[in-house]
Amino acid sequence: MTGDLREGPVAPAAGREGAAGDGPDEGEPGSTHAARREPEEFGSARFLNRELSWLDFAARVLDLAADPETPLLERAKFLAIFATGADEFFQVRVAGLKDRHAAGIRSRSADGRTVSEQLRAVRARATGLLGRAERIFSDGLVPELASAGIEVVSYGSLDRDARESLRGIFDRDIFPVLTPLAVDPGHPFPYISNLSLNLAVVVADPETGEERFARVKVPPLLPRFVALGDDRRLVLLEEVIAAHLERLFPDMAIGAHHVFRVTRNADLDLDDGEADDLLAAVEIELRRRRFGRAVRLEVDSAIEREVLELLVTELELTDEDVYRCTAPLDLGQLWSVVGFDRPELHEPAWVPATPPRLAGHGEEPVDLFAVLRERDVLVQHPYDSFATSVEAFISQAAEDPDVLAIKQTLYRTSGDAPFVTALARAAEAGKQVAALVELKARFDEQRNIVWARQLEQAGVHVVYGVVGLKTHSKTALVVRREPDGIRRYCHVGTGNYNSDTARVYEDLGILTCDPDVGADLNDLFNHLTGFSRTSASRALVLAPERFRPWVLEQVGLETAAGESGRITIKVNGLTDPEVVDALYRASQAGALVELMVRGVCSLRPKVAGLSDRISVRSVVGRFLEHSRIYRFGWPSASVLASCATRDDPAVAHRAAPRSVGSDARYFIGSGDLMERNLDRRIEAIAPVRSPELCARLEDVLALGLADDTHAWDLGDDGTWSRVRGDRGVSSQARLQELAVERSRRRHPAEQAG
């Protein structure tokens, strides 16, 4: 079964337009009092396809690019995000499907599709989305940008003076960089690099009339949009090059010319168990990746048949791999337009707030270690400042003479690399410093190699992870000598140690000197840097040893509680079949299951007898939702009393039924509910115990569930619908307001961190 559950023996739950979590009445098919069928009895149609679910997420991003309520340059940003995301999808997910197809793998996906069926479905869905993106650009953004004084114009529409101006730019800045490559018996078909923009040019010898093919690569280091003198008009670089092809092919007749772009398989084929030197092996594999198999060919819609056939043949593709485009190729290059200094076309600038307990007095910085000795601090970025919290934690540790050791995992770090600088400074000061640099962080491999070498040169002990696993945990450990002995200070987060993404990714982190968390991190780093096995943890939940069984145990506890059970989870992805089935069983037992899944989701909610009590939401807004929160059980009265949104009539805080104890367990961490996170990565999940900090998490969850501005709801048929309500709740805007309100309160007794 691969279709809608309604095609089979299972009918959708009735009346699901009501409040999320409303269950069926006693005796209805989904009632916990009716005979219950095991989830497996619903067949493969109980799962949604992972690849199509990712494309659904891309569609939600695309909706924001078309939303007239979104500021104009923010719409351009979302279109650029969609385009770059689509590139990665083809480089990794489609490439993986094609590899499986070529290998003759016959196994089906969780939703029952063969590889061929998935490839056909992906092509159909992707074609529609890419076509919509083109229309948004051509019919929406271009005319609206022109109205705002930013004109994207074609070369053919320019007057003589403008063309002369561009000719000067071409001769001075563009022509010296170009390299035309001919194709003939003495010049084989050139290698076309991944995601490069190219011109396919047909030239003819005027004397013989013989036609030849040539390729001109559009230089990636030059601006994609060439600005005319007044900077108000922009012309595509490839159009400027095409208008001056006679300079590249003098004495030849210029025939057809078309823009094309190739996408290649970009996944690393690396067996780290066989590699003697992982860094060298990754470098070799990165060079090989340049020559990955082509998986997609984008061409302009007017391309001549002969030219297209040549490209398809030489790139070893099929017609199914060709995508004809009516808009400019590579809309990801809109980032250069997004950066224009036009504040009125952007969202109002957001300056992250310093958490009150971390705010110093005047020029005197706060003593972070003294703050943490009082109690834990919870930070949520970008609402709370990353620079004055997490960066300051590592920087202060590097400078503090009483700090003996610093250990940190680095998965993706930023270009300015403040963490790399701080760790190097600490090592040069004689501290014991260890860094796990994950060389297999996709698309950041080369950057991480550079950081690893810099750290090694500074005297940092650098390791590259555990064989067979990717280290995805976001953890830092500081060991400090104090009057009463050695104390360990820790940070466990949901997001990378990256100053750039911390401004646009929503993430959480806890700063603590809890002895159990410190001991667990000590064991974890010994495992990462040495040969020790991870021992039983005291506070943290670590993957791969404990994450899967822990999730199933926690879900099982709420399942056993029946209608008194409650599960609320916020993650980026939910695709693991075993976890999905466990959540189905919780729903069948009567537990309330509230899921916030930003991206891919294989669970099908609101199906009678299977998932009546499950709701799935996705919030897609200005900031990329990236935090992972796990809450099991009902919040206590003390937690609810501490919620900043407790008196907000638009935000519903559900109190536990009278017959139910209030014992919610709260956790944050790096792991999603996907097989790779559960089984093939090192992840760290930390408990949050303080009622004040749990209230902060409760606010995040409640606002996400109440959002009727940037939220989507998943239906039983697998379609996502934009939530449109009359309350006007934007969870992200409200969290900004709460951060400002917290920063204005300075008395420690009022602060939760």
What are these regions (language model features)?
Residues 592-596:
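Hydrophobic alpha/beta core scaffold segments
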Residues 572:
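Cofactor-pocket helix-loop regions in the catalytic cores of large enzyme subunits
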Residues 1-567, 585, 589, 601-753:
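N-terminal localization/anchoring segments of enzymes in phospholipid and broader phosphate metabolism
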